[in-house]
Regions:
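N-terminal leader/targeting and accessory segments in enzymes
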Residues: 1-98, 102
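Nucleotide phosphate-binding/pyrophosphate-handling subdomain across enzymes
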Residues: 2-7, 17-27, 271-374
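Residue-level signal for inorganic ion chemistry
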Residues: 24, 73, 114, 143, ...
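Short internal beta-strands
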Residues: 31-37, 217-221, 353-354, 373-382
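C-terminal helical cap/extension that packs against the catalytic core
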Residues: 45-51, 364-420
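Beta-strand->loop->alpha-helix junctions that form or flank phosphate-binding loops
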Residues: 60-61, 97-101, 234-252, 305-307, ...
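Walker A (P-loop) phosphate-binding motif
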Residues: 99-141
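Flexible active-site lid/hinge loop adjacent to a nucleotide/diphosphate
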Residues: 155-243, 251-253, 258, 269-276, ...
């Protein structure tokens, strides 16, 4: 679609919506911003744009004459596609894109795209480093803080875009076709948005929908859903595994990551040479290595990059050591499966801070994963009673309920002994007490440093 001269509704007035509006104006479209919250400060929204174009903001009610005059709708990732207003756009025959589709249509060059329930941020950052070390023009975008739309105009034919893509963003793609895609894993998450596990899986798998036979899809062999999915794909499928040797693909063999490509069997790296902790991180490394290798980056270059790479902020991030107690920030552990990875990476007795906003997750598997490592479970937020009940059902009773994160950190300091770890790995979203998981992690680090 030629965007110049088109009237486009941008649904959502947050960072993503503003980025989309600015980009649309730059390519000659006429953006209109809409927010479903009638209390939205419309002037404040206008001030958030780059100020180079006139824009009208609607809040609460969208006038029918505005809706009837539209050529295209761009949804922010936070807007569910099953809202009555969004459904009415589809019924009207309007194209409905997300920011990823918009950026893809405007930008040029090849795209390497990563999705999955957990590990996306680390894998994206790692692949970004590998590609930046190997290529001239590389953009790392997505949920990692840089909106795809903000860089789209800079993406030329020789550019490589490494994009972290969430399930929300995949709901609204149309022609988006990565040269190499990866689905790291699929576990229960965001059921408050996608309603069923089947729908969540369907949306995640959309990342491969427009890929051709020359393209590559990297999948986790240890994920049964993905192993089955890989049998029916158009692109070439490359598996990675942390649980077994593969005839083709990349796998963990003891302390070595091995790449098997046809007759070639190559040791990529020893795990002790990496600065990342835990089996889940070795899976992230394997996914990034496979994506870069099948995009033509040499193994020597890949090896150098992955050995230099350090952990992403808020993902089992070492904070400090005080009085023999090590503090880790895993605020990115926003669901039980991610938090399981956090506790599995601990190699000392642990005081675990959990709880937060309720995403309708179940906590049984997380509590089973404590595996004798957790000395105290210190709970905060909306879910604290629900998690306490689940823990007690599993026979775990060393539980302390706190009002907020500051109190939880103080309690951990009082209870911890030299040789222990204190781990913030909430298994829940941050909303309610914090704006986002980054703010929660930053506050944790500040409280720890002030002990």
């Amino acid at each position: 679609m030629e965007l110049q001269g088109k009237k486009v509704l941008v649904f959502g007035s947050g960072k993503s919506g503003i980025g989309a509006s600015d980009l649309l104006a730059k390519v000659g479209a006429f953006p209109v911003i809409y927010d479903g919250n009638a209390e939205t400060d419309k002037d404040a929204v206008v001030h958030k744009t780059d100020g180079t174009y006139p824009v009208t903001v609607y809040a609460g009610e969208l006038p029918k004459e505005v809706q009837d005059s539209l050529d295209l709708v761009v949804l922010s990732p936070g807007v569910p596609t099953d809202l009555p207003l969004v459904k009415s756009f589809y019924e009207q025959g309007l194209p409905v894109w997300g920011e990823v589709e918009l950026a893809y249509r405007v930008g040029d060059g090849e795209v390497l795209a990563i999705t999955g329930t957990n590990g996306k941020t680390t894998t994206t950052a790692l692949l970004g480093k590998i590609m930046q070390d190997a290529r001239e023009s590389v953009f790392v975008v997505g949920n990692i803080g840089i909106p795809y739309t903000s860089k789209a105009l800079e993406m030329k034919q020789n550019s490589v875009t490494v994009a972290e893509i969430s399930s929300f963003q995949l709901e609204t793609i149309d022609e988006f076709a990565p040269k190499v895609s990866a689905i790291l894993n699929i576990t229960e998450d965001h059921l408050n948005r996608h309603h069923t596990m089947e729908e969540y899986i369907r949306v995640k798998e959309l990342i491969t929908e427009n890929q051709g036979t020359e393209d590559v899809c990297v999948l986790n062999y240890e994920d049964e859903v993905l192993r089955e999915f890989g049998k029916h794909l158009t692109p070439r499928v490359v598996y990675f595994s942390s649980g077994r040797k593969l005839d083709e693909g990349i796998y963990l063999d003891g302390n070595k990551i091995i790449l098997k490509d046809g007759e070639k069997e190559i040791e990529v790296v020893k795990t002790e040479d990496l600065k990342l902790l835990g089996k889940h991180n070795f899976e992230n490394v394997m996914a990034a290595v496979a994506m870069a290798y099948y995009d033509g980056v040499s193994l020597d270059s890949i090896r150098k990059s992955i050995c230099e790479f350090t952990a992403v902020a808020h993902r089992i991030e070492y904070v400090t050591e005080k009085k023999g107690v090590v503090y880790y920030n895993d605020s990115k552990g926003t669901n039980p499966d991610a938090a399981i990875k956090g506790i599995q990476a601990m190699n000392r007795p642990t005081l675990l801070i959990g709880g937060g906003y309720d995403k309708q997750s179940g906590y049984d598997e997380w509590i089973e994963a404590f595996d004798g490592k957790v000395r105290y479970l210190v709970l905060i937020g909306q879910t604290k009673e629900k998690i306490k009940e689940a823990a007690e059902k599993h026979g775990f009773h060393d539980i302390i309920l706190c009002e907020d994160l500051k109190e939880a950190v103080k309690v951990c300091e009082e209870k911890a002994q030299p040789g222990d770890a204190v781990l913030l790995s909430p298994a829940c979203a941050s909303w309610g007490q914090f704006d986002n998981y980054e703010q929660r992690g930053d506050m944790f680090k500040e409280y720890v440093r002030n002990l």
